[in-house]
Amino acid sequence: MNAKNAPRLLLAGLGLAWAGSGWAGQSLEQIRYALYKDPSADVTSDLRALAERGDLASKQLLGDVLANSDSANRQDIVSLYQEAFADGHGQIPALASLARLLDRTPRLQRSHEAWVRQALARYPNDRDPRSTSTSLEVFLVYPQLFPGERAAELLALYEQSCLLNCRPELYRAVVAERQGDRAAAERWYQQAARIDPRGIERYYRFLGERQDPAFLAFARSLEPEMASLPVEVVQRIGALLDSIHGTTRAELDAEREQRQSRAMGPKVEPTPEQLARDKADDQLRADGIAEAQRWLDNAVARGYLPAQVSKANFMISNPTEHNAEQAQALIAQVRAKDPTRAKALDAAFYMVNNWLTLDPQKSQALIDELIAAHYPDAQLLLGDLYSKGGLDQPDQERALAIWQRQAEQGSTAAWYRMATVHLRGRAICHDPVKAYTYARIALDLGETRARGLIKRLDKTLPKDDIERALAARNDLLKEATL
């Protein structure tokens, strides 16, 4: 055989082998490039095909893609990372990806500690920069698995060997916290929060009981620097501020409900003090919404897709504060980057009763297309359509049945939707105990929006009802595969 033709014949043979096996998808390198060009690119099917062929790197990347969806089953993602890690013989960074997922999912964090402990013993924790950074990622979630000064030693190695994209601040913060130096830990957490979106949530948790007022003060100190902060950080701060202010609004709602329930009977005109208090509360609500939206609007103006999606959802959820034209213009921006995500926003847009664009049939047609395309949140949207009465009257039983199936498959957003319907849904007998149960599960699985709902119910539910809700939550978590 001519040596010059050997490579060509080899490539032809490989091509025949792929063709013979029926493979027509993208290679892993092509998928990585597609995600580099568009982080929201739909690559799940091609990654699944590669993962099913046993490609460990594809399993890790598939896990990373699914981890960004609220609808993906968290236990399935854990399994992908574990398979990619392959007892330390495969993708070592898959353990870091697993740690990042578990950091956002408290319940899974507790149940997988033993496996992670064993995994740390399956590879040299400081063999090279990649294994060292992986070990430090695990340390962030399970600091108790690193005795003595081991974490500080790994951090020193990381700082010596890291050449690109080095971010030791969050590691330094947790090391200082473990060493009992809270002042140093807070300084490092604040530095981490300026450059790393994960640092924001970690700093918020570090603040403990004073977390809401302390984080608000920190965010306000950063507001003059907003334009120079990474857009991912700006988006995450806006989301956390929205959660904090949402919790405040929930507490104000609970207090108002309690006051109104005590005033049952003949109507009594509110006192000047009550009127002044209600006015102050309304101003507090408005100021909180405006503060969170300033951060979100900055990220939107910089073309950040997750912020554009969040803003569009905010407009759809608050139709009296925005108009249909504003929402459509923003959805058009999303469509230019992610047509499928824009279609999902359109489906929600056409459910809005307050706008003349209301078109439930069009919404249903779009949802049907999304279901046919296996869009992860399509079933959630279908539940929304029934819950809002888009096709007739509100059908909460049908909506709850759809969301229940999604919740059983691991959707955190489905648990949250069920909680909100049981608390304040139309055309259903409200059940605050069930609402508390589902909200706690949602929070356990990383759904931060549930915080406000829980705070509201903490103020209104009797202690016995809360205990019943927590017992039910524990039973459901034992039964569920999440």
Question: What are the residue ranges of the model-derived segments?
Answer:
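Bacterial N-terminal signal peptides that target proteins for export
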Residues: 2-10
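Alpha-helical adaptor scaffolds
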Residues: 140, 348-354, 368, 375-413, ...
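Alpha-helical repeat scaffolds
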Residues: 42-48, 74-85, 109-124, 148-162, ...
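N-terminal leader/linker segments that initiate helical-solenoid repeat arrays
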Residues: 14-71, 133, 164, 246-278, ...
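Short helix-capping/linker turns of helical repeat alpha-solenoids
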Residues: 54-55, 69, 87-91, 125-130, ...
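Structural motif corresponding to the intra-repeat A-B loop/turn of tetratricopeptide repeats
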Residues: 37, 69-71, 105-106, 145, ...
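Hydrophobic face of amphipathic alpha-helices that form TPR/SEL1-like repeat modules
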Residues: 30, 34, 64-68, 95-104, ...
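Terminal, low-structured helical/coil segments at or just beyond the last alpha-helical repeat
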Residues: 259, 264, 269, 449-482
